[in-house]
Regions:
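Short glycine/serine/threonine/alanine-rich loop segments
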Residues: 70, 98, 127
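Acidic/histidine-enriched active-site and ligand-binding environments that engage anionic O-linkages
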Residues: 118-131
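Glycine-rich phosphate-binding loop of ATP-grasp-fold ATP-dependent ligases
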Residues: 100-105, 128-156
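ATP-binding N-terminal substructure of ATP-dependent carboxylate-amine bond-forming enzymes
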Residues: 1-78, 82-95, 105-120
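Amphipathic repeat-derived elements
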Residues: 1, 60, 64-65, 146-157
Length: 157
């Protein structure tokens, strides 16, 4: 990599070329494992689902592969789905006896119905706290909150 500017590692200008590529369909034929690309069968030994974000990391694509009977590497449907949902993941790990950091999971409706209650519970964790959407990938929507004065804005973002 060296001096290479990683900001150029984006689809950007190549998007029209990629979108204009051949259409591919998964075959739902359990006697053959492969893709149909422009009417031509292409056999597959295994799929490497190198994806990011919704439908890539949340178990959706893995479920599609399983329905189609296509072998793939990496996490399965449940592990992928749990990994995308932070609250469910922490509850699952805690239920298995694995220590997890203190957290509070709440929905938008819960927050709106009794904001003062949730502000007190969150403050009881101690500052700073991190506010993050439960089902957003990577660092999307994350805020480091140092006190109650900025908590509301972080939660409602």
């Amino acid at each position: 990599m060296g001096d290479e500017d990683v900001s150029r590692w984006r689809l950007g200008a190549a998007l029209p070329e990629v979108l204009g590529g051949p259409e591919a369909s998964l075959m739902l034929d359990h006697t053959r494992k492969g893709l149909m690309v422009e009417g031509e069968y292409i056999p597959l030994d295994v799929i490497f689902p190198i994806l990011h974000g919704p439908f890539g990391e949340d178990g959706t694509v893995q479920g599609l592969f399983e329905v189609a009977g296509l072998p793939y590497v990496g996490s399965g449907v449940l592990a992928s789905a749990l990994s995308m949902d932070k609250v469910s993941f922490k509850q699952h790990m805690a239920g298995a006896g694995i220590d997890v950091g203190k957290f509070i999971g709440l929905t938008g409706d819960q927050w709106r119905s009794d904001r003062a209650h949730w502000q007190e519970r969150i403050a009881a964790l101690g500052w700073p706290v991190f506010v993050k959407p439960s089902r957003a990938g990577s660092s999307q929507g994350i805020s480091k909150v140092h006190g109650p004065d900025v908590l509301v804005a972080a939660v409602e973002e």
